[in-house]
């Protein structure tokens, strides 16, 4: 199946989103609308992939290039409409070389448009010998969509936009999805004669189908799953589609052996991976490339972003980002793990602990009320409550190293850079500024002063 070109339409503002950014840069299940559609289109390996931009053109172009450096960016001029967008794209593509064969055109506001549906559309188009083929679907409520008007034999006559449709046309439930395949020669002829004779004063790409009938057969292929071609025009639709899709994602994981107690409050993005017999408790958000091992327990009320949680680990009421939680390690409740933490096995970070860029050894515990940053903690070390690694000197982040088998007292302060050996014990309230050798007890002498008869200022 050779695809000469694919054109992604991303020029619109999306005014109903009421947003300061283009609609195509809003996210759905962890990816922008634009990137999701580009994913699906690119899977068909078109000879050329083009993205048409206009509103906040540079911003959208940058997002497209970050996905594919080789993408062709087409700037639509101030003449409105999808038909004009395709005119601009074809003019630029034909300048670069001959376009000969099927051309796929897709809107970029359908976040669930999948490569399988597109593949079947192109196959149907080619097998039917069509000059043009439109991807359609049947909706119980077709409000807002262009209607597919057929003749008595079922051939596609035209597509009528909602604002231009009469009463009988509005009753039609088969709708246009804004995805098409044209033969390049048919498309070139069809878009050449487009006019703006409509309520919006735009160049509609849908009008090209009527012209295409004179140059070749026009057909329609119905998407097997209406959800894959459902568009998003406002935030209400975005929320509804997100909820429906997330329910499907949760059901898929449950059928694969994962316990999800409340799918309504559990959100799982596409690139997440979960092992068998893991349990996801209510209020959990699993994002990015998070990986959860077998028998792990996540939640309730936990956010994992690009995190790895090994088998048997527990992460409760916590936020974890780009960190690795070792097997049978316990995190939480109310733990904040910033980027770059690496936990060994059977370790612990407890209540109101914050960590970043720290290695935590096997069996090591930081139970509560501590900040540990830019540090390395050895195996089987216990960190007392209220311990702080003072890692920032105002210019640089400095490293703290605490060895194996250490017992750190409550309320300790480690002034980095500092290194503490193995089997060291520190007294409560110690301030450790200098290196401590192995097998040492260290404490700070802080003299206590009692001022008798003291009264606070407001009582004097």
From Swiss-Prot:
Residues reported to bind UDP-N-acetyl-alpha-D-glucosamine: 9-12, 23, 76, 81-82, 146, 161, 176, 233, 338, 356, 371, 382
Record GO terms (molecular function): glucosamine-1-phosphate N-acetyltransferase activity; magnesium ion binding; UDP-N-acetylglucosamine diphosphorylase activity
GO cellular component, one term: cytoplasm
Subcellular localization: Cytoplasm
Residue sites binding acetyl-CoA per the record: 391-392, 428
Required cofactor names: Mg(2+)
Keywords: Acyltransferase, Cell shape, Cell wall biogenesis/degradation, Cytoplasm, Magnesium, Metal-binding, Multifunctional enzyme, Nucleotidyltransferase, Peptidoglycan synthesis, Repeat, Transferase
Entry keyword tRNA-binding: no
CDD domains assigned: GT2_GlmU_N_bac, LbH_GlmU_C
Bound cofactor: record note: Binds 1 Mg(2+) ion per subunit.
GO biological process: cell morphogenesis; cell wall organization; lipid A biosynthetic process; peptidoglycan biosynthetic process; regulation of cell shape; UDP-N-acetylglucosamine biosynthetic process
Start and end residues of each stretch annotated as Linker: 236-256
Protein family (similarity comment): In the N-terminal section; belongs to the N-acetylglucosamine-1-phosphate uridyltransferase family. In the C-terminal section; belongs to the transferase hexapeptide repeat family.
HAMAP family, alphabetized: GlmU
Protein name listed in UniProt: Bifunctional protein GlmU
Species, as recorded: Bifidobacterium longum subsp. infantis (strain ATCC 15697 / DSM 20088 / JCM 1222 / NCTC 11817 / S12)
């Amino acid at each position: 199946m050779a695809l000469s070109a694919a054109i992604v339409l991303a020029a619109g503002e999306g005014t109903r989103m009421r947003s300061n950014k283009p609609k195509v840069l809003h996210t759905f299940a962890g990816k922008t609308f634009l990137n999701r559609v580009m994913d699906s289109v690119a899977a068909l390996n078109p000879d050329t992939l083009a993205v048409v931009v206009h509103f906040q053109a540079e911003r959208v172009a940058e997002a497209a290039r970050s996905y594919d450096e080789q993408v062709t960016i087409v700037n639509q001029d101030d003449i409105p409409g999808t038909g004009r967008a395709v005119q601009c794209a074809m003019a630029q593509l034909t300048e670069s070389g001959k376009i000969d064969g099927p051309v796929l055109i897709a809107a970029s506001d359908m976040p669930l448009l999948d490569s399988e549906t597109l593949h079947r559309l192109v196959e149907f188009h080619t097998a039917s010998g069509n000059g043009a083929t439109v991807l359609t679907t049947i909706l119980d409520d077709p409000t807002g969509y262009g209607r597919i008007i057929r003749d008595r034999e079922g051939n596609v006559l035209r597509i009528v936009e909602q604002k231009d449709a009469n009463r009988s046309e509005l009753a039609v439930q088969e709708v246009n999805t804004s995805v098409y395949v044209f033969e390049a020669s048919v498309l070139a002829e069809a878009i050449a004669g487009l006019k703006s004779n409509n309520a919006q004063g735009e160049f509609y790409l849908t009008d090209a189908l009527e012209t295409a009938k004179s140059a070749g057969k026009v057909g329609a292929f119905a998407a097997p799953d209406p959800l894959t071609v459902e568009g998003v025009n406002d935030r209400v639709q975005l929320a509804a589609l997100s909820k429906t899709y997330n329910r499907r994602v949760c059901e898929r994981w449950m059928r694969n052996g994962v316990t999800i107690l409340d799918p309504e409050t559990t959100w799982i993005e596409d690139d997440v991976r979960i092992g068998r017999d893991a349990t996801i408790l209510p209020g959990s958000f699993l994002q990015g490339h998070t990986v959860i091992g077998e028998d792990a327990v996540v939640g309730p009320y936990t956010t994992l972003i690009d995190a790895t949680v090994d088998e048997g680990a527990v992460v409760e009421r916590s936020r974890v980002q780009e960190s690795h939680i070792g097997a049978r390690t316990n995190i939480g409740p109310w733990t904040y793990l910033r980027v770059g933490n690496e936990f060994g096995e059977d370790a612990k970070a407890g209540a109101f602990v914050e960590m970043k860029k720290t290695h935590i050894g096997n069996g090591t515990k930081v139970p509560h009320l501590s900040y540990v940053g830019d540090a390395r903690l050895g195996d089987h070390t216990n960190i007392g409550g209220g311990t702080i690694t003072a890692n920032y000197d105002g210019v640089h982040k400095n490293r703290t190293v605490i060895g194996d088998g250490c017992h750190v007292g409550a309320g300790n302060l480690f002034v980095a850079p500092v290194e503490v050996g193995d089997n060291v014990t520190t007294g409560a309230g110690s301030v450790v500024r200098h290196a401590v050798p192995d097998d040492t007890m260290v404490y700070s002498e802080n003299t206590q002063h009692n001022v008798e008869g003291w009264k606070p200022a407001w009582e004097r």
